[in-house]
């Protein structure tokens, strides 16, 4: 068996499976460290009492020193995002002239991006990418009959981006040839006033989902088959 099949062997304890999937195969700074630079309120000057001493007046009252922090890191993140996506991405399709079917396909692709609000999503993705150094965008379908794409469709395509900025932990599993074997992510969701932690994993042919039950994990629903035979998402890091 290959590595990912061995890890996800149903005969193994679920806790062992998830522990193996959490072995991050890339080196990315943790958000707990990055946020201290990204959020200006966490900068050292906000609690500096050495170089910015409070002044004690003769009557004993204290005049607190001005501690002004500047969010240059957050501004830089915004500027880099603007450089990339302030002007929306324009896709160019070749070899479509004189081919009606190809033109219809190109229009359908553009409609998919339009109704997935890709321009807004790109700005969100770039902000998260430059701030937290990693993102994962997943594409999925919801069953909703529509004609948005120029033809009758039973499904609607949507996308969602996960990043450590939103409290989501990403766990890509990449082999020595830089091929992604699995993409996992862990997040907490409020269900009926209760905080529940979930763990999801996508492979080329299956989608797994577990939830934390006490100190252990238990499956949620059945394993979903992925007909695309590809992980339906894109992971980026820097």
Regions found by a protein language model. Give the residues of each.
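Extended, helix-rich architectural segments
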Residues: 1-165, 174-178
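Structured, contiguous alpha/beta core segments that scaffold functional sites
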Residues: 131-132, 138-238
């Amino acid at each position: 068996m290959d590595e990912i099949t061995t890890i996800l062997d149903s005969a193994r304890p679920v806790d062992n499976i998830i522990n193996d999937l959490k072995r991050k195969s890339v080196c990315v700074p943790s958000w707990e460290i990055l946020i201290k630079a990204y959020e200006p309120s966490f900068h050292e000057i906000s609690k500096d009492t050495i170089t910015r001493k409070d002044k004690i007046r003769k009557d004993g009252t204290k005049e607190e020193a001005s501690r002004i922090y500047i969010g240059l890191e957050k501004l830089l993140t915004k500027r880099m995002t603007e450089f990339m996506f302030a002007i929306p991405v324009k896709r160019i399709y070749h070899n479509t002239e004189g081919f009606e079917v190809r033109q219809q396909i190109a229009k359908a692709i553009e409609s998919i991006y339009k109704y997935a609000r890709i321009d807004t999503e790109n700005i969100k993705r770039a902000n998260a990418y430059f701030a937290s150094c990693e993102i994962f965008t997943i594409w999925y379908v919801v069953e909703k009959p529509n004609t948005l794409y120029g033809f009758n469709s039973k499904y609607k395509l949507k996308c969602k981006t996960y990043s450590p900025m939103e409290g989501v932990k990403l766990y890509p599993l990449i082999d020595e040839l830089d091929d992604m074997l699995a993409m996992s992510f862990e997040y907490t969701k409020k269900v009926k006033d209760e905080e529940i932690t979930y763990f999801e994993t996508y492979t080329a042919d299956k989608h797994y989902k577990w939830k934390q039950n006490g100190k252990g994990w238990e499956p949620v629903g059945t394993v979903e088959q992925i007909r695309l035979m590809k992980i339906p998402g894109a992971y980026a890091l820097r």
